[in-house]
């Protein structure tokens, strides 16, 4: 982070501002700090200090290199919570994740999906609720698919069933 950037910025602000990270939503600090949400994440207490620190200073030696992974794993948990689903719902309605490239889906909004819940297996894809297919996103993103997981679209549409679209032409 350059010295010209806002000194009140956190690692999270910096990370969410990186081109290609627009699929991610902001995980609230109280959710990140809740020890229940940290269960099973190794070294999280050390990385938590870096993630929540008001100013990024890579020269301080406080960056561990795993911040992206740990934020991504907390993000995957958060988007399954009520607050997380609401945040992702807003992004879905705005079309932040893109639209289905299948012409018969009539530019149906898509959701991010990971092909695996295991970190490092694949990058994020987009899932069309109409044709039920996964595609490479048009946006320039290299986010790990584990930040969303393979079950996110199913959870999203089971909690918000009125958003699913039939395969017929919506213009008729």
Curated annotation (Swiss-Prot):
Induction: In wild-type flies, it is strongly down-regulated by double-stranded RNA (dsRNA) interference mediated by Su(Ste) transcripts. In males lacking the Y chromosome, the absence of Su(Ste) locus, relieves such down-regulation, explaining why it is strongly expressed. GO terms for molecular function: protein kinase regulator activity. It comes from the Eukaryota. Probably not expressed in wild-type flies. In males lacking the Y chromosome, it is testis-specific and constitutes the main component of star-shaped crystals. GO terms for cellular component: cytoplasm; nucleus; protein kinase CK2 complex. SMART domains: CK_II_beta. Interacts in vitro with the casein kinase 2 alpha subunit (CkII-alpha). The relevance of such interaction is however unclear in vivo. Belongs to the casein kinase 2 subunit beta family. There are multiple copies of the stellate gene in fruit fly, encoding proteins that are extremely similar, which makes their individual characterization difficult. Thus, most experiments probably do not discriminate between the different members. Unknown. In males lacking the Y chromosome, its strong overexpression leads to the appearance of proteinaceous star-shaped crystals in the primary spermatocytes causing meiotic drive, possibly by interfering with normal casein kinase 2 activity. This is Stellate protein CG33243. It comes from Drosophila melanogaster (Fruit fly). The gene is Ste:CG33243.
